[in-house]
């Protein structure tokens, strides 16, 4: 299958590498010139569960897409605030048969995608895989993970199941979900706790879990997400979601991982996606007249940190 990874950072590199290993024709597209140059010159290098691998993949700079060949599937991994620009830039690769799978962190991205892609070709999901970048063209890929996905509108269930099958053939453990909005909110609770808290506290997830207030902070933030989700007909099982979030503390699985927001801001001095995670809950709280004080404050803290570090 001809697959384009739109946003080839840490997670895009993981999916690109695994789909390439699975026999698909993969093209990476990214906006970081040094990263694209490194992959063109040396291949995508990865520490893959302790094994050093190099994959020679097609790669293009987002602002200089030369290919006019249409793609079968686009997997969106760009940063949320860059989604609209990415979709503009990859328009030449999209036709009426191109499927678009959004696996971005956060809530409500389909509203942006619909401006460029017909609803019957849009699929949304989330992933529990983790990944890191050690530098341009160099990924660190440890642990196991999974993907859940669903068609945006009814009638495309079989296509969604086929996409899950294609991803699973490359070891990505994908499955069809008939309630993806629940899964997206559940995953957003992971990001809404681990990302902001680890970034502000300058620790990995296991370190956060060792602090005495960690459990109370997780419970409070999950309750804020759940209160907003209820207004969108998503009823989170709060106890189950809290338990799920706190599995991230385990150092024998992914606890030693630094979340993507930490990598963006603390390691790479980049702006974060906080406005699409806790910030989204904060905005929706105002819309639905629901108090979200922890999400409000965490959003302000992260933006303050961005300013202090002069993130770009």
Curated annotation (Swiss-Prot):
Q: Which GO terms describe its cellular component?
A: cytoplasm
Task: Report the domain of life of the source organism.
Answer: Bacteria
Segments traversing the membrane: none
Q: Name one GO biological process term.
A: pantothenate biosynthetic process
Pathway recorded for this protein: Cofactor biosynthesis; (R)-pantothenate biosynthesis; (R)-pantoate from 3-methyl-2-oxobutanoate: step 2/2
**GO MF terms on file?**
2-dehydropantoate 2-reductase activity; NADP binding
**Binding site residues for substrate:** 105, 191, 195, 260
Signal peptide boundaries? none
Compartment annotation: Cytoplasm
Q: Which UniProt keywords apply?
A: Cytoplasm, NADP, Oxidoreductase, Pantothenate biosynthesis
> Which residues of the sequence carry a binding annotation for NADP(+)?
7-12, 105, 131, 273
UniProt-annotated catalytic positions:
187 (proton donor)
Record field: catalytic activity: (R)-pantoate + NADP(+) = 2-dehydropantoate + NADPH + H(+)
Concerning its family, UniProt says: Belongs to the ketopantoate reductase family.
> Any idea what job this protein has?
Catalyzes the NADPH-dependent reduction of ketopantoate into pantoic acid.
UniProt name for this protein: 2-dehydropantoate 2-reductase
The organism encoding this protein is: Lactococcus lactis subsp. lactis (strain IL1403)
Q: What is the lineage of its organism?
A: Bacteria, Bacillati, Bacillota, Bacilli, Lactobacillales
